[in-house]
Amino acid sequence: MSAKQDDTQPIQAASKRLLKVILEGEALTRLSPLQEMDRAQAVADLEAENVFSLERPLPGMTPVSEQGPYVLHLSIQEGRLIFDIRRQDDTFLTVLALALGPFRRLIKDYHLLVDSYVKAVQEAREARIQAIDMGRRGLHNEGAELMRHRLNGKISIDFETARRLFTLVCVLHQRI
């Protein structure tokens, strides 16, 4: 590779990412300590490292004007997951709405696992805690695959970004 190509790669990588994630919604005021911990960790991890970019140009815009880094306002409104995507200066870029239906079973399972985890911690059952952690990892992996599938053709994300976004969807959504 030439030096010129090497110089552009960090710029391209920096433009295909989320700079900031903002969660919106009343559900955030009623989080359990474990859900709050999941939320804080997912947001911190997302802001530190992620892959996120629009896959196709928006009408009337050039691909260069749509490059990130992006600010993501994530919320749930009227049964839909809302990706309000903005430029680095927080000016509006686009909104993507996904139906929550395909996520419902996984969200319900997430809340059941959170309840089971809290109970296992209270009872100091180490083997149970480890089993629940394994289940949570599997659930998050399944949620990540579904997230990537649902965003396919719209937003390009890697597996770890999808996993963290799935965590935030679960935190935003009240019990089903």
From Swiss-Prot:
Pfam families from the UniProt entry: UPF0262
Domain of life of the native organism: Bacteria
Record-stated family: Belongs to the UPF0262 family.
Name of the protein described by the UniProt record: UPF0262 protein GbCGDNIH1_1393
